[in-house]
């Protein structure tokens, strides 16, 4: 494998054995592609905004004299960029402008004569834009739109599994689900009649819908039944015989023909009898007259002489009727063929319960069901039914729905109309009846072929269409009002409903979620999440066990491991690593094609529907050199089952061993050795890891770390290759390679880094360069590390030296014992940034004022404020300190005219304002790192705001001029090259000032042209600089758009440094979580024979019952990795020659059986080997991919190479006594995470505080500054101790005895330590509640 200069800095040894056929795809493509489809112009009009516009326009007036047509749309440029939107608290969006055409037709003239056409571009609100990382900035906060897994449109056949009716009879049903419009359900009742429901309302006999479609009884019977024909000849009854229909029946008479008896009366008719009848080609048999009694007539029979109806279709025949028919000359009688086995009489029975008899009565019945209480008219009934399923405005199956519909009914074509046809409804009923008759299967609704993904783009389009439809109504009204000659398109359109619909979706939809920004992994997982909840989805309460369970079709599409614990389990899933959605929104996963028994590298993406037809081998099947399967029998999956198949039956093979799991689970090494429940916790807890001060790459990883770090967008990645020309903490400049430049550009890429920004979870986002001056970089190399990344690899925690042993009960029940060294080295120190805002409003009594002049506050409290009353940057503040001084006018008294006069003369009195300053919340302390002041337009800016503005302007100017210098330098170096090539001497050039270079003339025409081009570029560059500076200045100095009534907002950012302490929650990657019980001095920790103490002591009893053995293997492999690092470190310290180092490192990389990674250090320069060794000092990073990891033997070899015991256990000594522990202990390196459940955020104590209004008891919870609840169990405990007075105190004066507690306060102040308990308020509440039941209870004093 070829490594770039940057990748050579640290190479992760890979133990994977299977070749990597397919690279991990870009992990955010599900979000970005979907949104791209939404906003890009689609000439076909299939997707996105274009589709929404085309579905609503043209809008015609009611009279038809005018219409508003859609021409095209364009999205403008956003006003602010992403960072500015976040700072200002606005939405990152672009204005949508639509070109509309108003066409007015001549009234009297023939159809379609145009009188006037007006075209105009109309503003239609703002469309939020997606950032490069797949998020939206809404009102200044980053949000993610989660994809939804919902039931695909189409037709579904299902059964109630015998649960509805007490007899346990299975009732079948069919449901047609459109993309938008009314649902149509068909269902059987226990008596086997077929019913229909529209939109889940009350049921009607299903034949009503057929009558409404204008079918007669005769046509209905003709559609659903085969016929049995009887003929009357010579007073004998003969039946046309179809032998196959007799199967399984018992002969009620002798079946004979041509004098031969085939079946005797009372015998069961078997397949042999049927074969005999078919062989002899028997067409007619004579039947006794009684046989026809009870058969059902298939059509109306009329006496032709009198015109009288003898019997109507669907009537049962009797012998009398037969005689009548015979007399009136009907010799051929058609009856319905039914039997109990596979031709049930369901439709015929349903017609008998159907109260309607023609189309009109059926339409009226449907109208009554849909609009109960309204008097039906013919027109209303007809238009209602027409609009339900046959109008494109109201009903749409969508392309997906039509495809699923036609596939389900086994039709050839998969495209068609979006509305239903007569045939559609009849075919669904036919299939449902077939299923009831025992032919065909019901669908599995949890199959991923029946559930599809709705992503951002599609949901946004639906919301946009909702807004457009609201506008459509208003436009229709306006078009009809007349006076069109003076109106323009923009007078018709009101953009409010559109922007309101879009805003509502992005701001408050259930699927628009506040982004989880704890660390890069939690961002990526949030964007790849798939929820079954949300509008049009399931609800937690109704979702049963089946929906939540893992389904065979999840394989390679949805992760079986990563899902939340709790009420949402199984409803919120994560996309598997290689999964993607197809054009219809179904999930597909890649497979390698197997042709003639050879596994090729050809990749096919299969959806769950297609996958069912193939035999698919697992990724770990052994192949030989040519790609043939080694074993004769291969473990494969087919039709959702796993079994052995011979190797020539295999159609496809998995692409990769990690295909099954999601990104989160694929980061767990040795996942294959962990119990699934613990793996679930491990995958979920990695998302809660807080980025540490110094990221530390995991020694034992899986090889997915780089992909996650790069794709998450927290790192700065080189867009083009080149050389690092300049680097400091906040910017990196790359001089681009000649071959990657666009013609006529400066060839300089500038990357500005994010510094100390607050994330959604209050963690710190900060980027640090990881390249040095002069280094070559290639496209895709990581230039700067973000939070939780180390040299471009995801690094969520720290590698800790752990020992598995009990230690004085300090690791009882999953507690963790930590060495003080961990605190000293700041291994788990994290930085949290809090934003505190102070809002100054305009009140009824006058404006609030931000000032340092606060009543009744001492000098000390104001020491950290400047003259504007705002805290200095860099001030260290603790709980209760004032950050922003603010006073609010107090209007307690109405002033007399005299006082008003005195006020006016002598100025304001200080007493009429109250202090409402912003203070640091209790229990928080930190350093002020930034202050921002936002002032409303037209309000005078204070001194501090002007200072901040000036600073920002200075910074912007500095940044831009530095940028200009860098670009100029790049340009002039090219100008110089052209001049020198054109024959100007270099020395002469260097003496001239640079500006004069462009005035030189060259004889070579081509070179002169180049020079002129460069001169043009130089002018453009300067012009661009001026423009940018002006735009920046305008943005910085303009007033802010604040919400009504707000004059000023001051935001203060506090950085809080949190060291690890007892009570903090930590975890490994295998679901092994615990709380720190004690920070132990280094000298008391167990140490080994070299005197090295361990960092963390874990309880060995936490392993066997939880079955997460992965953590032990990780510990051993971590030890080996560290051992090799130690040996390299020793060699570096002894300054051994490069050849020896190279040889040792090469040995380490070559270790392991048949590993896919080949690292050839002979191609590395000495300098590169030294740098690699330098980076391997702390341990050699190792990748052990999921399901394809390091074997036990390989771990032992690696331990041997690092001169460590192969058992992975060493002798430890007690740090306090120096005695050896009695048996060897497992010691190694485990990757530990500090989770975002910090004791600082949870610890809380209350002295006095607010009370609940009704019960007068203290509030609960830290946010309300509440008290600790003394609940019933605690009361029982005090009762058990007999501590009556303590209990009385708890229930009265310390809780809700209002008078008692005020007296208590007085007594304490007076030094009189006695209490006088009274009546608790909650008892009064109880009395009131009993009175509300009409029982009067009064307390009487004795």
UniProtKB/Swiss-Prot annotation:
Naturally occurring in which organism (per UniProt): Escherichia coli O6:K15:H31 (strain 536 / UPEC)
The terms under GO molecular function for this entry are:
DNA binding; DNA-directed RNA polymerase activity; ribonucleoside binding
| Protein EC | 2.7.7.6
GO BP, sorted A to Z: DNA-templated transcription
* Phylogenetic classification of the source organism: Bacteria, Pseudomonadati, Pseudomonadota, Gammaproteobacteria, Enterobacterales
Database matches in InterPro entries = DNA-dir_RNA_pol_bsu_ext_1_sf (IPR042107), DNA-dir_RNA_pol_bsu_external_1 (IPR019462), DNA-dir_RNA_pol_su2 (IPR015712), DNA-dir_RNAP_su2_dom (IPR007120), DNA-dir_RNAP_su2_hyb_sf (IPR037033), RNA_pol_bsu_bac (IPR010243), RNA_pol_bsu_CS (IPR007121), RNA_pol_bsu_protrusion (IPR007644)
Listed under GO cellular component are: DNA-directed RNA polymerase complex
Q: Which PROSITE patterns match?
A: RNA_POL_BETA (PS01166)
Q: How does it assemble?
A: The RNAP catalytic core consists of 2 alpha, 1 beta, 1 beta' and 1 omega subunit. When a sigma factor is associated with the core the holoenzyme is formed, which can initiate transcription.
Any Pfam family: RNA_pol_Rpb2_3
Q: What is known about what this protein does?
A: DNA-dependent RNA polymerase catalyzes the transcription of DNA into RNA using the four ribonucleoside triphosphates as substrates.
Can you say what this protein is called?
DNA-directed RNA polymerase subunit beta
């Amino acid at each position: 494998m070829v490594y770039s200069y940057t990748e050579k800095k640290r190479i992760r040894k890979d133990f994977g054995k299977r070749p990597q056929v397919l690279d991990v795809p870009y992990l955010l493509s599900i979000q970005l592609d979907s949104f791209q489809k939404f906003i890009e112009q689609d000439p076909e009009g299939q997707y996105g905004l274009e589709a929404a516009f085309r579905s609503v326009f043209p809008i015609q007036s009611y009279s038809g004299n005018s219409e508003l047509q859609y021409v095209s749309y364009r999205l403008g440029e956003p006003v602010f960029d992403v960072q500015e939107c976040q700072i200002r608290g606005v939405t990152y969006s672009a204005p949508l402008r639509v070109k509309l055409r108003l066409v007015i037709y001549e009234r009297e003239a023939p159809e379609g004569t145009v009188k006037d056409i007006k075209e105009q571009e109309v503003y239609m609100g703002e469309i939020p834009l997606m950032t490069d990382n797949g998020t939206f900035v809404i009102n200044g906060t980053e949000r993610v739109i989660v994809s939804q897994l919902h039931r695909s449109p189409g037709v579904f056949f299902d059964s109630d599994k015998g649960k509805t009716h007490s007899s346990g009879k299975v009732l079948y049903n069919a449901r047609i689900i459109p993309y938008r419009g009314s649902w149509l359900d068909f269902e059987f009742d226990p008596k086997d009649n077929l019913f229909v429901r529209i939109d889940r309302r009350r049921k009607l006999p299903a034949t009503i819908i057929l009558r409404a479609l204008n079918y007669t009884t005769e046509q209905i019977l003709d559609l659903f039944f085969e016929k049995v024909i009887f003929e009357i000849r010579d007073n004998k009854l003969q039946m046309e015989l179809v032998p196959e229909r007799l199967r399984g029946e018992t002969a009620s008479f002798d079946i004979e023909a041509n004098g031969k008896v085939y079946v005797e009366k009372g015998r069961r008719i078997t397949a042999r009898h049927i074969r005999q009848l078919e062989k002899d080609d028997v067409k007619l048999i004579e039947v006794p007259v009684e046989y026809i009694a009870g058969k059902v007539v298939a059509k109306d029979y009329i006496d032709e002489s009198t015109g009288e109806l003898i019997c109507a279709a669907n009537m049962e025949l009797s012998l009398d009727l037969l005689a009548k028919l015979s007399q009136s000359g009907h010799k051929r009688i058609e009856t319905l063929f039914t039997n109990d086995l596979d031709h049930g009489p369901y439709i015929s029975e349903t017609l008998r319960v159907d109260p309607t008899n023609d189309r009109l009565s059926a339409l009226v019945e449907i109208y009554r069901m849909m609009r109960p209480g309204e008097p039906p008219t013919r027109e209303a009934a007809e238009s209602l039914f027409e609009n339900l399923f046959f109008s494109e405005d109201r009903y749409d199956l969508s392309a997906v729905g039509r495809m699923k519909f036609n596939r389900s009914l086994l039709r050839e074509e998969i495209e068609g109309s979006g509305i239903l046809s007569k045939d559609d409804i009849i075919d669904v009923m036919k299939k449902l009846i077939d299923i009831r008759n025992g032919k065909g299967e019901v669908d599995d609704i949890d199959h991923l072929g029946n559930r599809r993904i709705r992503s951002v783009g599609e949901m946004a389009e639906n919301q946009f269409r909702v807004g457009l439809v609201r506008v459509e109504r208003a436009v229709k009204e306006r078009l009809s009002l007349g006076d069109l000659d003076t109106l323009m398109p923009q007078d018709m359109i009101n953009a409010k409903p559109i922007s309101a619909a879009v805003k509502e979706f992005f701001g408050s939809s259930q699927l628009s979620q506040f982004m989880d920004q704890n660390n890069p992994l939690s961002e990526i997982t949030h964007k790849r999440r798939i929820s079954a909840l949300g509008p049009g989805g399931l609800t937690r309460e109704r979702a049963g066990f089946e929906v939540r369970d893992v389904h065979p079709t999840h394989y390679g599409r949805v992760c079986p491991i990563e899902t939340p614990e709790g009420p949402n389990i199984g409803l919120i899933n994560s996309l598997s690593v290689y999964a993607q959605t197809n054009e219809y929104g179904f999930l597909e996963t890649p497979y390698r094609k197997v042709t003639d028994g050879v596994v090729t590298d050809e990749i096919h993406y299969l959806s769950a529907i297609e996958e069912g037809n193939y035999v698919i081998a697992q990724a770990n099947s052994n192949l030989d050199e040519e790609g043939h399967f080694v074993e004769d029998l291969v473990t494969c999956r087919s039709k959702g089952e796993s079994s052995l198949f011979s190797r020539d039956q295999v159609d496809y093979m998995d692409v990769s061993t990690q295909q099954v799991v999601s990104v989160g689970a694929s980061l767990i090494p040795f996942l294959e050795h962990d119990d699934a429940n613990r793996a679930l916790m491990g995958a979920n807890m990695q998302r809660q890891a807080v980025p540490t001060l110094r990221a530390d790459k995991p020694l034992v990883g899986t090889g997915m770390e780089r992909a996650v770090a790069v794709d998450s967008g927290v790192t700065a990645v080189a867009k083009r290759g080149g050389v690092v020309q300049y680097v400091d903490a906040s910017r990196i400049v790359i001089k681009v390679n000649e071959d990657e430049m666009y013609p006529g550009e400066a060839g300089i890429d500038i990357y500005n880094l994010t510094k100390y920004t607050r994330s959604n979870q209050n963690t710190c986002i900060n980027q640090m360069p990881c390249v040095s001056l002069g280094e070559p970089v290639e496209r895709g190399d990581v230039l700067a590390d973000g939070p939780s990344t180390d040299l471009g690899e995801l690094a969520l925690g720290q590698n800790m030296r752990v020992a598995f042993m009990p230690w004085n009960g300090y690791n009882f029940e999953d507690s963790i014992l930590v060495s003080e060294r961990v605190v000293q080295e700041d291994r788990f120190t994290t930085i949290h940034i809090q934003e505190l805002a102070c809002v100054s409003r305009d009140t009824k009594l006058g404006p609030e004022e931000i000032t340092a002049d606060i009543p009744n506050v001492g000098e000390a409290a104001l020491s950290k404020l400047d003259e504007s009353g705002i805290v200095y940057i860099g001030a260290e503040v603790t709980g209760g300190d004032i950050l922003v001084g603010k006073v609010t006018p107090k209007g307690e008294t109405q002033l007399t005219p005299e006082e008003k006069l005195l006020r006016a003369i002598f100025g304001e009195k200080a007493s009429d304002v109250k202090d409402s300053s912003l203070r640091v919340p209790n229990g928080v302390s930190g350093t002020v790192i930034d202050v921002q002041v936002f002032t409303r337009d037209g309000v005078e800016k204070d001194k501090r705001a002007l200072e901040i503005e000036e600073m920002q302007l200075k910074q912007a100017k500095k940044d831009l001029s530095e940028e200009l210098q860098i670009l100029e330098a790049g340009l002039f170096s090219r100008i110089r090259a052209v001049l020198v090539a054109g024959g100007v001497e270099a020395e002469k050039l260097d003496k001239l000032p640079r500006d004069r270079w462009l005035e030189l003339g060259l004889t070579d025409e081509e070179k002169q042209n180049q020079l002129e081009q460069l001169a043009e570029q130089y002018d453009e560059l300067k012009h661009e600089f001026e423009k940018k500076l002006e735009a920046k200045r305008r943005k910085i100095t303009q007033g802010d758009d604040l919400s009504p009534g707000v004059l000023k907002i001051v935001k203060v950012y506090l950085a809080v440094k949190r060291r690890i302490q007892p009570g903090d929650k930590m975890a490994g990657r295998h679901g092994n979580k615990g709380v720190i019980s004690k920070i132990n001095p280094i000298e008391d920790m167990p140490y080994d024979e070299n005197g090295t103490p361990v960092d963390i002591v874990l309880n060995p009893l936490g392993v066997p019952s939880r079955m997460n053995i992965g953590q032990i293997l990780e510990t051993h492999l971590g030890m080996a990795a560290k051992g090799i690092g130690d040996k390299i470190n020793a060699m570096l310290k002894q300054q051994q020659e490069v050849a020896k180092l190279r040889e040792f490192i090469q040995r380490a990389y070559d270790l392991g059986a048949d590993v896919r990674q080949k690292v050839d250090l002979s191609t590395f320069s000495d300098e590169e080997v030294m740098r690699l060794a330098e980076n391997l000092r702390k341990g050699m990073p190792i990748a052990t991919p999921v399901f394809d990891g390091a074997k036990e033997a390989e771990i032992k070899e690696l331990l041997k190479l690092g001169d460590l015991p192969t058992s992975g256990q060493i002798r430890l000594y007690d740090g306090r006594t120096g005695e050896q522990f009695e048996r060897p202990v497992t010691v190694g390196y485990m990757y530990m995470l500090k989770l975002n459940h910090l004791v600082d955020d949870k610890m809380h104590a209350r002295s006095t505080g607010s009370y609940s209004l009704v019960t007068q008891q203290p509030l609960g919870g830290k946010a309300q500054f509440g008290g600790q609840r003394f609940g019933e169990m605690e009361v029982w405990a005090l009762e058990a101790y007999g501590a009556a007075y303590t209990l009385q105190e708890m229930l009265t004066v310390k809780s809700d005895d209002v008078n008692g507690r005020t007296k208590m306060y007085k007594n304490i102040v007076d030094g009189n330590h006695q209490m006088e308990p009274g009546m608790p308020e909650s008892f009064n509440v109880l009395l009131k509640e009993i009175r509300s039941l009409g029982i009067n209870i009064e307390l009487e004093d004795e």
